[in-house]
A protein has these predicted regions:
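Interdomain motor-coupling "hinge/lid" segment immediately C-terminal to the ATP-binding subdomain
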Residues: 2-14, 141-211
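Pre-Walker A adenine-sensing motif
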Residues: 13-32
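Hydrophobic anchor at the beta1->P-loop junction of P-loop NTPases
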Residues: 37
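Walker A (P-loop) phosphate-binding loop of P-loop NTPases
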Residues: 41-42
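Conserved lysine of the Walker
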Residues: 45-46
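Short glycine-rich substrate-engagement loop in P-loop NTPases that contacts/grips substrate
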Residues: 67-101
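Structural recognition of the conserved hydrophobic beta-strand(s) that form the central parallel beta-sheet
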Residues: 127-133, 154, 163
Length: 211
């Protein structure tokens, strides 16, 4: 993997989590824990990472100390496990500090042999979060694969209450009493069961509504 190409990809991808609108999910997360976010595609695993990054930023961690790589990027198709350490090297170069950066590796299962890398980085006391959605990542064996170094967090599609919050309806839908509010909730429920209940589905619905 060409080092300069990888560095450019990392810089490009920073805009993804900086500019993506964030809807906080109803999961309790700690910033001093290594997480492995698993779940079917389109349930918002990446957004859990964005949520973690926003919390670190709120806690005063400079963005230069945050490394985010999404391995769905087609420019990374030829990347191998041997190249993964370049991510850490480039991250340390960008941060211009000896302080260990936080790593967020999205859909890392796309790289064969990724397991040894993340175990080694965790053993070196880096804070690292990963996501995955293939059959191996979703299996009960993932905990043993990661050797107890990560908390496995299963991410599920939106509940209906989360879906309402994502669509700017902050009222408790169980307490809705006016005719208009009932109609609004029914309209959202129809979309929820028709189009889907994931973060990406919510964005697609918003796009449809603006057509």
């Amino acid at each position: 993997m060409n080092r300069d190409t990888l560095k450019q990809i990392m810089i490009d991808q920073k805009d993804i989590y900086l500019n993506n609108p964030l809807i906080t999910r109803q999961y309790f997360l700690e910033t001093n824990v290594n997480y492995c976010f698993v779940g079917i595609r389109r349930t918002g695993k990446s957004y859990m990472m964005y949520q973690q990054i926003k919390q670190l930023e709120a806690d005063g961690i400079p963005l230069s100390q945050i490394i985010y790589v999404n391995f769905e990027d087609e420019r990374l198709l030829e990347m191998t496990a041997e190249d993964l350490n370049l991510i850490l090297e480039i991250g340390l170069e960008i941060s211009e500090t000896d302080i260990k950066p936080y790593l967020f590796l999205d859909e890392i299962q796309n790289i064969n042999g990724w397991e040894k890398f993340v175990r080694r980085i965790a053993d070196m006391k880096y804070r690292i979060n990963i996501t995955g959605s293939n059959s191996k990542m979703l299996s009960s064996e993932i905990a043993s694969t990661l050797g107890g170094r990560f908390v496995i967090m299963n991410i599920y599609p939106y509940s209906f209450s989360e879906y309402l919050i994502a669509n700017n309806m902050t009222k408790n839908y169980l307490d809705v009493i006016s005719t208009k509010d009932r109609a609004d909730v029914q309209n959202q429920y129809n979309k929820y069961v028709t189009y889907g209940d994931t973060e990406e589905d919510k964005q697609e619905i918003a796009a449809i509504d603006h057509i």
